Amino acid sequence: MNSTVKYRADIDGLRALAVLLVVLFHFGLGFPGGFVGVDVFFVISGYLIGGHIYQSKLAGHFSWGQFYVRRIKRILPALIAVVIAVWLVMFFISTPADFRKLGRDAAATLLSVSNVTLWNSIDYFSPSAEHNPLLMTWSLGVEEQFYFLAPLLILVLTRFDKKLSFLLMGSVTLLCFAIAAAGTLQIPHSAWFLTPFRAWELFAGALLGMAHTHFPAAFSAKADNLKSAVGVLLIAG
């Protein structure tokens, strides 16, 4: 039970690959499926955050206040800097109408609801979307909303034994996957932006974090390197 989710070079490598794929997709450099990098990010975030919460609660030292303070310190300073930089640049080059729209998007970004605002105003895959300098903050909105939901669910799961907690988390993940699959077919625009349709990826990562807690041998360095190599091949394919 003393296994913790520490720094992982393999995860950093997958994160770097995910960023590269998204960048190549947006620059139109022959990677039409590069947006899968977003999915990789969500699973990694679920694994790191979900695993941390689960382990901290089992060890008896989880603190709601400390959890959110750490999230704020990690995300908000860089996010504010990006928003200010974008605002300053766009002040000189955008039209008054576009600048007003940027103000709305910036406020939504800082309030962790940029995915909802963009869902209501833009088609992610349309050429015009590329002109929105805060377009990519939608995924951060999804992650931040997950930070509000995950602790409550995972803290409930720690009240049950290992087998039942795994079963419940697996059931939640499968239910969210079914919702996402149905949404992708029926309302793909909403399924791209909104957290209920993205939750299964984050919960799948959290499930892996729980597995890491109870089965650390399955996450040895050799096993991790093998799984990372397989992951890279699957993403590249």
How does the language model describe each region?
Residues 1-237:
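Membrane-interface helix/loop caps of multi-pass membrane proteins
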